[in-house]
A protein has these predicted regions:
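ATP-dependent carboxylate-activation loops
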Residues: 81
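Basic, Lys/Arg-enriched alpha-helical interface segments
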Residues: 1-65, 74-78, 87-112
Length: 112
């Protein structure tokens, strides 16, 4: 089964477009793993505890650790919400709150 991936609002797209082509290729590689692999290794995709169904896509380069927050809409759609450079051990709460808010907005938009 192929997973469809879409970005909601502009946060992910703005971040992606601001990266150089090498980083963009790394992001695309990891998103392709999510899209095509039946079981994505946890080093690339992890459910975040104590959240409203938010997942963290992990893109690791030699100089940066990039996180893309997302959620599932049904069994075959991943919705990307926001993206950031991870600088600490824990995922910043403000980024999680933003992803949860965008998820709520997405569901309202979808159902209206």
């Amino acid at each position: 089964m192929i997973i469809e991936i879409t970005a909601y609002k502009e946060k992910f797209v703005e971040f992606y477009n601001s990266q150089d082509s090498k980083i963009q290729r790394k992001i695309e590689y990891v998103l392709d793993l999510v899209r095509y692999e039946k079981k994505v290794p946890q080093k690339f995709l992890k459910a975040l505890k104590n959240t409203d169904g938010i997942y963290e896509v992990r893109v690791i380069t030699s100089f940066r650790s990039i996180r893309i927050l997302c959620f599932m809409d049904g069994g075959n759609l991943v919705v990307l919400t926001n993206c950031f450079l991870k600088k600490t051990q824990k995922t910043p709460k403000n980024q999680i709150k933003l992803a949860e808010r965008l998820k709520r907005e997405y569901l309202i938009d979808k159902n209206s």
